[in-house]
Every structure is written in C-alpha cells, then in structure tokens.
C-alpha cells in the first residue's frame, strides 16, 4: 500500500496548526520537520523551497511534516513576533516525535 501525503491539523499553543504529513513505511525511518519562511513576508508551508525540501526528505525515506505557523493558511491564531511561532514549531516537533517513536 502506497503512503500518501496527508492534510492534518496538529494541536498547537494557539489552536490548530495546519500541516502536511508523510509517514514512511519503514518504522526506523528518520524524521524531518520543515518550517515555513517568515509569515510577515508571505511565507507559508506551500512556499516552493518548503515543498521541494519536503519532497526531498520524503523521497529519501524520511517521515516528514511541513507546518503553517499560527495565523497562516488554515492555522488558528495570529502572528506573535517569533515567540509564538517558536512554540508552534516545538508543538509540531513533539507531535511528529510522538507519531513516529511512541509505542
């Protein structure tokens, strides 16, 4: 069965975070979290560099996730001058680790 890229929502400190997720079929695969460019300058998880990086990890056997920070796309909340966005990244990484390493 072929894995697919899933559109998901991750619980974040300011509400739901919109994300795309690919889970490798290999249970020992490494993980990667790809973050968007600065949201105040038009950065989203759909930025070409983000998408290309996501696919490069995916093509090399990683379980990989890309996330929109708070207030971007379908993510809840609003821009928080970097502090909230750092908390969003931490929440996404925690989720990614639980999804891939918890038994």
Language-model features: locations:
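A domain-start/cap signature at the N-terminus of enzymes
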Residues: 1-8
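Short strand-coil-strand connectors
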Residues: 11-13
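Serine-hydrolase catalytic machinery in alpha/beta-hydrolase-like enzymes
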Residues: 16-101
């Amino acid at each position: 069965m072929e894995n697919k890229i899933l559109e998901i929502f991750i619980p974040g400190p300011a509400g739901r975070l919109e994300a795309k997720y690919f889970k490798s079929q290999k249970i020992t695969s490494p993980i990667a979290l790809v973050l968007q460019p600065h949201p105040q300058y038009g950065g989203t998880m759909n930025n070409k560099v983000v998408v290309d990086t996501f696919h490069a990890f995916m093509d090399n056997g990683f379980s990989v996730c890309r996330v929109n920070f708070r207030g971007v796309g379908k993510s809840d909340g609003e821009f928080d001058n970097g502090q909230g966005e750092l908390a969003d990244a931490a929440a996404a990484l925690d989720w990614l680790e639980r999804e891939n390493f918890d038994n």
